[in-house]
């Protein structure tokens, strides 16, 4: 099979991360989600904790200056490209570096935009019914429904703002992706199988052309 890159965007509680991991296993490649934070930290010289605090958020420096810069590594502060755009570039470079090394699945972090000029890229967006998403967050976070709904609203607002700002596109809008699918209809397992078959068919079309 030819080299392939799969980008998975997802609503919170949709099972997107689980599906991405299953796709990676299906296609024999590595799945990058929070692992990208470690790669970006290595690229930048900043601590991984700094990237964790600002993951998929447009306002990178809010937590930074409110907490008196505890997340910098030992590298000289002024020798790093210390700006919001600079930090985004470190993460983008980490995504490109991973993509150059072989087949991979990326979860979120505007990977679809970062890799827009790469060949054999498939962009997927996974949604789910709000009730299913609330249940998933309740279980994962051990919180009640009201708190879960608030968690979803707050984090998706941040995620959309981050995506829209850096890509000039709209997070979750169908025109940004090759396939959008609601995991509530088929469940996690069957949704992954459906996506995998779509990817195989799409890859065949790319090869034949």
Residue ranges and their predicted role:
Residues 61-70, 144-188:
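Small-molecule kinase domains that catalyze NTP-dependent phosphoryl transfer to phosphate-bearing small molecules
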Residues 92-96, 165-209:
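NTP-dependent small-molecule kinase module
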Residues 117-140, 145-153:
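Conserved phosphate-donor/acceptor-positioning beta-strand/loop module used by diverse small-molecule
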Residues 98, 111-117:
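RNA pseudouridine synthases
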Residues 2-5:
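Extreme N-terminal starter segment of soluble prokaryotic enzymes
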């Amino acid at each position: 099979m030819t080299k392939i890159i799969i980008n998975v965007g997802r609503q919170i509680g949709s099972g997107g991360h689980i599906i991405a991991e299953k796709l990676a296993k299906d296609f024999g490649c590595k799945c990058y989600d929070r692992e990208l934070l470690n790669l970006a930290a290595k690229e930048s010289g900043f601590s991984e904790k700094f990237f964790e605090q600002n993951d998929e958020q447009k306002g990178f420096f809010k937590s930074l200056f409110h907490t008196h810069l505890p997340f910098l590594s030992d590298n000289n502060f002024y020798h790093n490209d210390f700006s919001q755009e600079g930090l985004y570039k470190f993460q983008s470079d980490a995504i490109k570096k991973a993509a150059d090394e072989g087949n991979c699945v990326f979860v979120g972090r505007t990977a679809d935009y970062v890799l827009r000029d790469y060949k054999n890229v498939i962009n997927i967006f996974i949604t789910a019914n709000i009730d299913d998403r609330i249940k998933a967050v309740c279980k994962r976070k051990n919180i009640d429904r009201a708190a879960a709904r608030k968690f979803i609203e707050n984090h998706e607002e941040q995620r959309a703002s981050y995506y829209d700002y850096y890509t000039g596109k709209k997070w979750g809008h169908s025109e940004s992706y090759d396939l959008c699918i609601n995991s509530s209809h088929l469940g996690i397992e069957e949704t992954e199988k459906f996506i995998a078959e779509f990817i195989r068919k799409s890859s065949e079309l790319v090869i034949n052309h």
